[in-house]
Amino acid sequence: MSLRIVRLGSERHPDEGLRIGTVRRPPRGVPKQDFARRNFFDVWLPLLAPSEPLLREAQAAGAVQPGGAQAAGRVQGGGADERSWRTFVRKFRREMQRPDAARTLDLIAALSHATDLAVGCYCADETHCHRSILRELLTERGAAFAAGEPLNPAKKSL
């Protein structure tokens, strides 16, 4: 029983279990019935994605890429300045302190001890993506990660 942090649309691990999409929007141009078949997600949980206002603010500051559903929540790797990234991290962590989000994170952490789960986003680079922050938040809550799953791929948040 364990948790993985994944890129949505990537090939599934054999023991991955339920894949949860923590993105603001579902994949553009993909019929709902194909989300799981095409390895996006089994369950959509936008509650654990950055809010629309935070995404707009981060895009304006250059911390995240503007674009369609695939880019929603994608933080630029390399080109993002660290101050913008730190601001994004601080504000996203604050959003995840809301009772509904905090309880959901607690639930996922607890479930990781009872079943196999995966949480993901579309971003290619986890180090500059909200899923790296979710990884930290779930680690802080005692989530059981899959063997070989990095606990902290590149500590970027403050």
Regions inferred by a protein language model and the residue ranges of each:
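Residues lining hydrophobic/aromatic ligand-binding pockets adjacent to catalytic sites
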Residues: 1-158
